[in-house]
């Protein structure tokens, strides 16, 4: 059997170029050196012949046995003696007993360096560098995969920023639906929504706060879009001048108009701001049944007759006409407007200066040559009728 293994080994390793046998020293010390390196972790091309103190890296167990068998087969083939080859073949199995002592000695020699390296290795593994630490974003992703809510976790450091909560579309639909019916949630409903949507009460509360602020902002923007000037639409525009007319809010309050009777204006002024009767029939027609009582006087309102100068039937008993520049070609033979007995309260600034303009020598309807603007004090009992005194506001 020994011959067979010998010849097989020589056939397997015959292609190797072996060194000359003169360069090796054979002796009893030859069997001790491979045993010292059997369990070592060092790796080398061949089995070394030097002492363990200067030993180069060696192979592991399987490689070591193969190399030693290779070298022993080369030595035996070169020497040509079967006994030498058999002893070399038996060397690895026989040297299996001493490895304990030799390996322990080598372990003792290696212990200082090995202990230092072993101590350095745990130190390297225990040291955690900043880029190895787990960031909050990674922990959020992991917790989301596990189904946990990341907002409830306290941040790792005081400087870390809270990550925004990403709501799903289903959660947003439910929250918007709830906001449509109730802008403020009570506590039981909030708990119910939190259980339904798999959120926390704090998240739902914060979402509703943000949604209310968004709603208020939208309402403000809509309000500014509807009234760009910043005032309400029903507000009348300010008076820009003495001839500016504000009909809208003041024609309904004709009853409260106080009558101002200043000194009579000059009659032959150029044609401007004339008042045609057609311009007054529509806005003042609704004031027919109203009865006037002048402040401080006791004159009862009567219907005007056909000779009153204003021939339009719709305007009989209508309020007085305020004329800024009253243009009439009436002769001055009749009595003028002696209205000094009437009180003069503060007059509201109503000025109908936007009526239709007509030529300068036009009358206000078919008028008698003698006007019937009578003095209210002297003709009250004789005529049997009382005309309204026109309010003449000289502007």
Curated annotation (Swiss-Prot):
SUPFAM superfamilies documented for this protein: Homeodomain-like (SSF46689)
Positions of the UniProt region annotated as Disordered: 1-122, 135-163, 217-247, 363-395
Main location: nucleus
Motif (Antp-type hexapeptide): 128-133
Subcellular location as annotated: Nucleus
Gene Ontology MF terms in the entry: DNA-binding transcription factor activity, RNA polymerase II-specific; RNA polymerase II cis-regulatory region sequence-specific DNA binding
GO biological process: anterior/posterior pattern specification; embryonic skeletal system morphogenesis; regulation of transcription by RNA polymerase II
Keyword DNA-binding attributed: yes
Compositional bias per record (Low complexity), positions renumbered to this chain: 71-122
GO (cellular component) term, any one: nucleus
Alphabetically ordered keywords of this record: Developmental protein, DNA-binding, Homeobox, Nucleus, Transcription, Transcription regulation
Pfam short name (any one): Homeodomain
Stretches with biased composition (Polar residues): 138-147, 374-385
InterPro entries from the UniProt entry: DUF4074, HD, HD_metazoa, Homeobox_Antennapedia_CS, Homeobox_CS, Homeodomain-like_sf
Entry keyword annotation includes Acetylation: no
Record's function text: Sequence-specific transcription factor which is part of a developmental regulatory system that provides cells with specific positional identities on the anterior-posterior axis.
Stated name of the protein: Homeobox protein Hox-D3
Taxonomy of the source species: Eukaryota, Metazoa, Chordata, Craniata, Vertebrata
Encoding gene, per UniProt annotation: hoxd3a
